[in-house]
C-alpha cells in the first residue's frame, strides 16, 4: 500500500479578502499530493487522484460543497529539497481565460506590427535612397543637356526677338494708317449725307415756288374773268392804265422768269456736275478700300507664311541639335559611317535653315513695300478729301445764290399781291418750265464689309504669341 499525504485547500468566493489581494486568487483551488520517492506513483493513479480530489470540497473542517461550474484547473508539479514531489492544482474561470487569451493576442499583434513597421520602414528608406540617387544622376545629365540647349536657343531667340520687334513696329504703323483712313472715310460719309440733305431741301423749296406760281396763274385767270364782266364807264381809261401797268409788270416778270430759269438750269448743271464728281470720288474711295483689303489679305498671307517658316526652322534646329548630340558622343569603328551620315544631315539642315532665313528676309522686304504702298494710298485719300472740301465750298456758294433767288421771288410775289389789291383787273399768265424732280440721283455711299483695325490687331497678337 502506498502512503501518501494530501492536503486540499479550497478558497471560496465568499471568504474574506484582503484589500490589496487580486480578485483572481478567489477561484484558485490548490491540491497538494506528497508522494514518497521510493515508490513512484504511476500516471494513471495520479490522474485518478486528481479526479477524486476535484470532487472533494473540504477546507479545514468546513462542510462539503460543490465547486462552481465552468472552472478550468491546471496542475503544476514541483520537487522540494526533500525530494518530494508536489502537485499544485490551479483553477480559473472561462471568462478569465478568454480575457488573458485576448490580451496575449493583442500583445502579439502589436509586436508583429512594430516589427513590420521597423523593418518595412527601413526597406522603404533604402529604396527611396536608391531612387533619389538615380534621379540625381539623371537630373545632372539633363541639366547639362539643357544648359547646352539653352545656350543655342538663347542666340536664336535673340535673333527672332529682333525680327519680331521690327515686325511689331511695322504693324503698329499699319494700324495707325488704317485708323486714320477709317476716320477720314467716316467724315467723308457725313459730309456727303449733309450735301444730299441740302440738295433735297433746295428741291423742295423750288417745288413750293412752282406751286405758288400756279396758284398765282389761277388767280390771274379769275381776275381776267372779272375784268371782262365789268361794265363801268371808265373802262377804257382803266384798261389803258392797266395795259400799261400790265405790260410793264409782264416785262419785269418775264425778265425775272428768264433769269430764274437760266440760273435754275445753271444750278442744276452745277449740282449734277458736283454729284458726278462726288460719285467719282466715291468710286475712287471704293477702289482704294478694295486695294487696302487686298493689301490686308496679302499681309495676312505673308504673316502665315512667316509663321510656317519659323515653325519649320524650329523643327530643323531641333533635328540639328539631335544630330550634334549624337555626334558629340564617343565614336567607335562601327559608328564612323553613322557619324558621316550625321555630318551630311547636319550640313543639309544648316543649308535649309540658311535658306529659310533668306526667305524670311525677303518676306520682310515685301511687307515693307506694302507699307509704302499703303502710305501712298493714304496720300491719295488726302487729295480726294481736299477735292471734296472744294466741292463743299462750291455747294455752299450755290446755296447762297439759291437764297438770293428765293428772296427775289419773295419780292416779286409781294409786288404781285399789291397790284392785285390796287387794280383788281390785272391778269398775269406765265408758262412755267417742266419740273425736274425726277432728275435727282441716288448717291452711292462707300461701304466697307470688314474692320481693318481689328484685323491688324489679330495679326499683331499672333506675331507676339509666336
UniProtKB/Swiss-Prot annotation:
Signal peptide (from-to): 1-20
Keywords of the record: Cardiomyopathy, Cell junction, Cell membrane, Coiled coil, Cytoplasm, Cytoskeleton, Disease variant, Membrane, Signal
Tissue specificity annotation: Detected in heart, liver, skeletal muscle, placenta, small intestine, lung, prostate and testis. Expressed in arrector pili muscle (at protein level).
Query: Where is it located?
Result: Cytoplasm, Cytoskeleton; Cell membrane; Cytoplasm, Myofibril, Sarcomere, I band; Cytoplasm, Myofibril, Sarcomere, Z line
Location (main, coarse): cytoplasm
- Per the record, which residues fall in region Disordered? 1-23
Any transmembrane segments, and where? none
Quote the cellular component terms of the Gene Ontology held in the record. Answer: anchoring junction; cortical actin cytoskeleton; cytoplasmic side of plasma membrane; I band; RNA polymerase II, core complex; Z disc
- UniProt disease link: Cardiomyopathy, dilated, 2K: A form of dilated cardiomyopathy, a disorder characterized by ventricular dilation and impaired systolic function, resulting in congestive heart failure and arrhythmia. Patients are at risk of premature death. CMD2K is an autosomal recessive form characterized by predominantly left ventricular involvement, although patients with biventricular disease have been observed.
Q: Spell out the protein name for this chain.
A: Myocardial zonula adherens protein
Give the gene name: MYZAP
Amino acid at each position: 500500500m502506498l502512503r501518501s499525504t494530501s492536503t486540499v485547500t479550497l478558497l471560496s468566493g465568499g471568504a474574506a479578502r484582503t484589500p490589496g489581494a487580486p480578485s483572481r486568487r478567489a477561484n484558485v483551488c490548490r491540491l497538494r499530493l506528497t508522494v514518497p520517492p521510493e515508490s513512484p506513483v504511476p500516471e494513471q493513479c495520479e490522474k485518478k487522484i486528481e479526479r477524486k480530489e476535484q470532487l472533494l470540497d473540504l477546507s479545514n473542517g468546513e462542510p462539503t460543497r460543490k465547486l462552481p461550474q465552468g472552472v478550468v484547473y491546471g496542475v503544476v508539479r514541483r520537487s522540494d529539497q526533500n525530494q518530494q514531489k508536489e502537485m499544485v492544482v490551479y483553477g480559473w474561470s472561462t471568462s478569465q481565460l478568454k480575457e488573458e487569451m485576448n490580451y496575449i493576442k493583442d500583445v502579439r499583434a502589436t509586436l508583429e506590427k512594430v516589427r513590420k513597421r521597423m523593418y518595412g520602414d527601413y526597406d522603404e528608406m533604402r529604396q527611396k535612397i536608391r531612387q533619389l540617387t538615380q534621379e540625381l544622376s539623371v537630373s545632372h545629365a539633363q541639366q547639362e543637356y539643357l544648359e547646352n540647349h539653352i545656350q543655342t536657343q538663347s542666340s536664336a531667340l535673340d535673333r527672332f526677338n529682333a525680327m519680331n520687334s521690327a515686325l511689331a513696329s511695322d504693324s503698329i504703323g499699319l494700324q495707325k494708317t488704317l485708323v486714320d483712313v477709317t476716320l477720314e472715310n467716316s467724315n467723308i460719309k457725313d459730309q456727303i449725307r449733309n450735301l444730299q440733305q441740302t440738295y433735297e431741301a433746295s428741291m423742295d423749296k423750288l417745288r413750293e415756288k412752282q406751286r405758288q406760281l400756279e396758284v398765282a396763274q389761277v388767280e390771274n385767270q379769275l381776275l381776267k374773268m372779272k375784268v371782262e364782266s365789268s361794265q363801268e364807264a371808265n373802262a377804257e381809261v382803266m384798261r389803258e392804265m392797266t395795259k400799261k401797268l400790265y405790260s410793264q409788270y409782264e416785262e419785269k416778270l418775264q425778265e425775272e422768269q428768264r433769269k430764274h430759269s437760266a440760273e435754275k438750269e445753271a444750278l442744276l448743271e452745277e449740282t449734277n456736275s458736283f454729284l458726278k464728281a462726288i460719285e467719282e470720288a466715291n468710286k475712287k474711295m471704293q477702289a482704294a478700300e478694295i486695294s487696302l483689303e487686298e493689301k490686308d489679305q496679302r499681309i495676312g498671307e505673308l504673316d502665315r507664311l512667316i509663321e510656317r517658316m519659323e515653325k519649320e526652322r524650329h523643327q530643323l534646329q531641333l533635328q540639328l541639335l539631335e544630330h550634334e548630340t549624337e555626334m558629340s558622343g564617343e565614336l567607335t569603328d562601327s559608328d564612323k559611317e553613322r557619324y558621316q551620315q550625321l555630318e551630311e544631315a547636319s550640313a543639309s539642315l544648316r543649308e535649309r535653315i540658311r535658306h529659310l532665313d533668306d526667305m524670311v528676309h525677303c518676306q520682310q522686304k515685301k511687307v515693307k513695300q506694302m507699307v509704302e504702298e499703303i502710305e501712298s494710298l493714304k496720300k491719295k485719300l488726302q487729295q480726294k478729301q481736299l477735292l471734296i472740301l472744294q466741292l463743299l465750298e462750291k455747294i455752299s456758294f450755290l446755296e447762297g445764290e439759291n437764297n438770293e433767288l428765293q428772296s427775289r421771288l419773295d419780292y416779286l410775289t409781294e409786288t404781285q399781291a399789291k397790284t392785285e389789291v390796287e387794280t383788281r383787273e390785272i391778269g398775269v399768265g406765265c408758262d412755267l418750265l417742266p419740273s425736274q424732280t425726277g432728275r435727282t440721283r441716288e448717291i452711292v455711299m462707300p461701304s466697307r464689309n470688314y474692320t481693318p483695325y481689328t484685323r491688324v490687331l489679330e495679326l499683331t497678337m499672333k506675331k507676339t504669341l509666336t
